[in-house]
Design a protein with these regions (language model features):
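Non-ligating segments of multi-cofactor redox enzymes
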Residues: 1-255, 265-286
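Donor-sugar nucleotide-binding helix/loop cap in glycosyltransferases
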Residues: 260
Length: 286
């Protein structure tokens, strides 16, 4: 019977990987951008992708929701701000952090890196509980407050998260543009090198610990996590079937006690707990 549960978990992983890869390809369909050394500026760029996908990636056909939110907050265009916030709310209400589990290209990259064999994988970092609040701090300070209140003489702010932190932007936008554009290579300075360090640390940690960026840093995950308890797509635990055996938490790479908190703000809805539950106590509720 355990083998059956294990096979169900593997099938769930394959399905999720297929959806992730398909959406990553859809979000980055302008492959000519690399050969033409340009950023796509078609009509779809007015639409935000649900996951973290850099606007400046030459292949990207959608905008990044976090980049867009910073841009509109710093520009004082509140009508567009309401559009971006409304779009994030729609994604959150319907899917919650299922966006992170199925529709985020940078999440896919971390999933693939974690599959690389390593001598000792880590379940959590020291002070894990406190570190999980870091993404809310980054959301509040770097995505909202700094772009809104730290402005130049014209009243415009900067995209602080994109400029100083975002490893997805460095990988998808910064590195390709610097490699493809000689003028940008000459202009790349301290900030670019700083972000290379952040990217390198994120990628290396992703081999050892599951989704460190999503778990501790991502402000988009912080937004969607708030919706997990109220989103249409959420998990339910049948208390009559559940024996609190802990199989769900043991299989959860984010170390969530699903039996106690099935709609944790940390849950990315990968579905492995549901597939592995020996009592079929976990279900998807709408």
């Amino acid at each position: 019977m355990y083998r059956d549960w294990l096979m169900r978990g593997k099938s769930q992983n394959k399905l999720r990987l297929f959806v992730q890869a398909a959406f990553c390809a859809l979000s980055n369909g302008y492959v000519l951008g690399f050969s033409r050394k340009e950023i796509f500026e078609g009509a779809t760029k007015y639409i935000c992708a649900p996951g973290l996908n850099c606007y400046s990636c030459p292949a990207a056909v959608f905008s990044c929701p976090i980049g867009s939110l910073q841009a509109v907050l710093s520009s004082r265009d509140y009508k567009i701000s309401l559009y971006v916030i409304g779009l994030l709310t729609v994604f959150g209400v319907f899917l919650g952090r299922a966006v992170c589990g199925f529709l985020c290209p940078f999440g896919l990259l971390q999933d693939l890196l974690f599959k690389i064999p390593f001598a000792k994988k880590i379940r959590r970092l020291p002070k894990d509980g406190a570190l999980r609040y870091l993404r809310f701090f980054i959301l509040g300070v770097f995505v909202i407050l700094l772009p809104l209140f730290v402005v130049d003489i014209t009243g415009l702010g900067e995209p602080w998260f994109c400029k100083w932190i975002c490893p997805a932007g460095t990988l998808g936008g910064g590195i390709p543009l610097v490699l493809l554009n000689s003028a940008m290579r000459g202009a790349a300075g301290f900030i670019f090198r700083w972000k290379i360090v952040i990217l390198a640390l994120t990628l290396l940690l992703s081999v050892v610990i599951y989704r460190p960026f999503c778990r501790y840093v991502c402000p988009l995950g912080a937004i969607y996590g708030v919706f997990n308890k109220i989103s249409f797509y959420r998990f339910k635990v049948d208390e009559e079937k559940c024996t609190k055996c802990g199989a769900c938490q043991k299989t959860c790479k984010l170390d969530i006690p699903v039996w106690r908190n099935p709609n944790s703000a940390d849950c990315i809805r990968c579905g492995e707990c549901k597939a592995i539950c020996p009592h079929s106590a976990i279900s998807v509720g709408i």
